[in-house]
Amino acid sequence: MTIPSALVVGGGLAGMVVARELALRGWRVILLERSRRLGGKAGSDIKNGRLVEHGYHVFPQWYPNVRAIVERIGVQLIDFDRYHFLLPGGYPRKVTVLGPSGLSAMWHYVFNGLLPWYHNILYIYSVLDMISRPLSEKRFLDRVSQIGLIRGKWYTSESVAEMGQENVLKASAIPVYDLSAMTAKRIASYWVRQASPFLSILPGDLQTVFIDPQVRELEELGVEIRYGSEVCDVVMHEGVVTAIGLRDGTELSADIYALCTPIEVTRTWLHDHLYKADPELGNMHFLEAQPMAALYLRLRRELPDLPREHVFLHGSYYALSFIDVGRHWKRLDGEHGGHQLSFISSNYSPLNEVSKEGAKDLLLEEISEYLPITPADVESWELNPNTDVPLFINTIGAWSNRPRPKTTIKNLYLAGDYVKNAIDLACMEGAVSAALEAAAQILSDHGETESLPVVQIPAEWPRALLVLARILIVPFVAVARVIAWLEEKFSPHRPDASEVRIKATPRLQMDSRPPRKR
């Protein structure tokens, strides 16, 4: 019996999952990777003797497929049940938010959140209203933004809208007026149902703790990993793929081909013959991606009262958040370091053409408004602008333009977080879910009927229960809305926010990104 063969293009998380699932079932697999390591955006690089990630990654409880990998390779995650907000000039005072794991956590949020209690009630109700919408509205929800969905609602105050705008941008690099309401509904539904632990992180960097153990698995399964293999062409003949062309002029052939590269790479191969064989793939050109930059600061001195969990800089123009990985990771020499702050800038587009040194100075200038850090306190720094490796963003109407794992070309498959999957967000769980679906489709198409890969879908609360909860709290929401309306109408200084936040709000409402290409 002939052993089936597969060429997997792209050694990111999706490509690794596809390669493993096929190799487990006896396939001969070649994995092509352009760089000198696997992992893609979920990996780390050594720069100046230190490991630097694409950006800090989180592992929520609603990552069942990613957490299955973590459990398989024997890694114990570090769990958090809260996160924090800092306001300019307020350190070390912080606003702590507990994950919505129960009534006590919700009560804490209402009376200890960033906004007064009545705005917090309205914000909670806005989330409840969104996640309780029926699945039959899926098509409508994908064609309206999250902010567009709630703006016309009777319960929406200006502060609630602004809070939602900032949270979305920092979490996904997507402006709230661009984020598909369908994506927002799904992610919120998953998080509300599985809120404990709210967030988890690895006890070390992604490459060493998460990716390298999977690389060893692939090697033990006989997967042939070819580093430094830059693909430049998908060779077609009579409507099927016949080879993958490399930059050095060589061509490689197999029975099936799985393209597991990022969207900005995959769509460069949509030439005449490939497009003609499956015109729907051309819709990938309508999909968008934005950079989410990472800045690492190693400090010379200790900062008192620095939280161990994630911290969001409220009102930050560059949408900054961070975590002190120094207290959770070990250095390359095996010792725990001092403060090593891992920042993410979700609004980095204004700095796209600024030099690394200049961008670092501008980011540090804003960071110093929130933390007592001066340039003299920084022992070393690394900046990953990530403009060459942007994140796919779930804009309005994107779902219909996203490809499925199986193309209409009988031996070509796709995997990656931009491919249609149940998670519907650019994240590790989305990439793994799409990869498992692609692997299952490949095996099914080649006669496999048993032990196919199974995609675990995060649980959600029953809609009937959500609707009931929404109805029961309407009287409280009505009272909160009246108070918020009176405040907005008669309070010129809007006491729901600090003066700093009032000044920051216009900046948050600005769109500093270049016009989108249509």
Each language-model region and where it sits:
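Mid-domain catalytic core of redox enzymes
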Residues: 229-341, 346-352, 366-371, 481, ...
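N-terminal Rossmann-like FAD-binding beta1-loop-alpha1 element of flavoenzymes
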Residues: 4-31
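Active-site-proximal substrate-binding core of FAD-dependent oxidoreductases
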Residues: 441-489
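FAD-binding beta-loop-beta segment adjacent to the flavin cofactor pocket
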Residues: 330-335, 387-422
